[in-house]
């Protein structure tokens, strides 16, 4: 499963997830693998860039295998709850400021996911 969200406000999860995420997190995910990606604006919201992936991560952590983490090297941001020990919890995408890197980041992430989902 691949779950994606935009980040709204200051690191907030998109409202569309409000009704879905609690019931999804209660599902039997034990034998599933889940990858997360988040869209955000690393320039305007540098201290909360792509934080919304953390909300999803926290809701499903320990209930499934979460795959698709990405090293934070090359990303320009100040802080984010979407990062633990220098590693993003999924793929952060900034089409506003780092659009020139999006294709390469997605391609590398998909190649990693292919190995995980086999």
Language model features: what each stretch is:
Residues 1-118:
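FMN-binding flavodoxin-like domain, especially the glycine-rich phosphate-binding loop
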């Amino acid at each position: 499963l691949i779950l994606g969200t935009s980040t709204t406000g200051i690191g907030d999860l998109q409202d569309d997830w409000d009704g879905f995420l609690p019931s999804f997190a209660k599902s039997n995910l034990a034998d599933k693998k889940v990858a997360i990606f988040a869209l955000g604006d690393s320039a305007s919201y540098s201290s909360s860039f792509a934080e919304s992936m953390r909300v999803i991560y926290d809701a499903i952590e320990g209930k499934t295998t979460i795959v698709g983490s990405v090293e934070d090297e090359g990303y320009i941001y100040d802080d984010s709850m979407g990062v633990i020990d220098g590693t993003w919890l999924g793929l952060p995408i900034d089409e506003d400021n780092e659009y020139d890197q999006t294709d390469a980041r997605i391609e590398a992430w998909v190649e990693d996911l292919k190995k995980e989902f086999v």
